Amino acid sequence: MERQSPSRSSHRRALRLLAAPALAVGLLAPVQSASADSAGAAACPAPAAAIGLSTGWKLQLPLPTSSGSPQEIKQPALKTYNKAPWFTTTSDCKAILLRAAVNGATTSNTGYPRSELREMTADGSATKSWPSTSGTHTMIVDQAITHLPKTKPHVMAGQIHDSSSDVTSFRLEGTSLYITSYNTPHYKLVTSNYQLGTRFQGKFVAHDGKVDVYYNGALKATVDGAFGSGYYKAGAYTQANCNNSSPCDTSNYGQVALYGVTVTHK
């Protein structure tokens, strides 16, 4: 067997020593990157502050209380509230992510879970309601639907609700985005080619016993609706549950990115 010369053996040991720091740097790099990402996310303000959300809202979550009903976060707690992944700031700090999984807690009048903001009085101390037959009531919502549940890929994003049911909303089914009218889910087709993550502006204007609904500034539908106790909602209202969508767990959800929402009453 050939013996290695001292010079060749020393040369190989030197190469190994030189390679070791480079290998160590390569192994540490992803950890440093992950730390930087975490630091960036931590630097984001609370969700409400990220989009300048007014105090005139409360949050309804798909998370159960001890009694099984959905959790509600009211003012002033909502100002600083963050509950990932159900209500949190996007990584670029520009929007709120609202998520509702199919196995989430639901309110008594529905079988579907929601992560939604519900309109309140200006200081958030009481629920707000108004008539469509008097005055002009407007909500502008800047949003993107970013995820759909499986099997039944339906999500509502932004709506007017009255004392008993939703009056009108934006509803995505697969790639088809609709404006609804009460129990008519396909009242008006806005687009048949909606791509998840596409940001759009929706506007609802309730006046004279009807609601005009706009998509990116263009009037798309007018819904007849004379109601006395209307209110606005913004966020993700997943139209699927464990009876019609699988798997029945938190990996199966609807999600909306909310960049801004404003409400005016005149």
Language model: regions and residue ranges:
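Secretory/extracellular carbohydrate-interaction modules
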Residues: 77-176, 265
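Short strand-turn-strand beta-turns centered on an Asx-Gly dipeptide
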Residues: 214-218
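N-terminal module-boundary/linker segments of secreted carbohydrate-active enzymes
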Residues: 34-84
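Ligand-recognition surfaces built from glycine- and aromatic
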Residues: 43-64, 134-140, 150-154, 225-266
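Secretory targeting and sorting signals
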Residues: 1-37
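Short, aromatic/His-centered strand-loop micro-motif at the edge of beta-sheets
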Residues: 178-201
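Short tryptophan-centered beta-strand motifs in secreted/extracellular beta-sheet-rich domains
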Residues: 139-141, 197-213
